[in-house]
């Protein structure tokens, strides 16, 4: 069955993200977490926090469908080594992140939605692939401080 990516779908997933305590929501196109390729919408609202992490065994691709976001790349000590503003209105649509690269993203606009592609199957990130130098998702003050620092 064909699956259409429409304004209505983006609006729906964005609404769910705004209502979520994490301020983000996925919409999966893949049939199961065991699928060999994961394709999903990821709706992100300003204030959501994705801790810096890496995928040692897979690349990850983001394409911005609506809104804009900053993508950060870090060295092993947590220093920002590159920052990319993904913004379709500026002609920068997406990024492919090599495996093993520490990265995180910050939504800059309400209603930001990305199309994300990576290899499956889904496996929770092992502790060594979640940055030890970054605040945990439960550390709201630390997460806010990281976001503030990155946006300056």
Can you annotate each of these PLM segments?
Residues 149-152:
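Conserved small/polar residues in nucleotide/adenosyl-binding loops
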Residues 18-52, 58:
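A short glycine-rich, His/Asp/Glu-containing loop-to-beta-strand
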Residues 57-74:
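Glycine- and acidic-residue-biased ligand/ion/polar-headgroup-sensing regions
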Residues 49-51, 58, 70, 91-95, ...:
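Histidine-centered metal-chelating micro-motifs
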Residues 123-144:
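C-terminal end-helix/capping segment
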Residues 77-99:
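Short acidic-glycine-tyrosine-enriched beta hairpin
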Residues 1-20:
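N-terminal leader/capping segments at the start of a protein or of a new domain
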Residues 110-126:
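A short hydrophobic beta-strand segment most commonly corresponding to one strand
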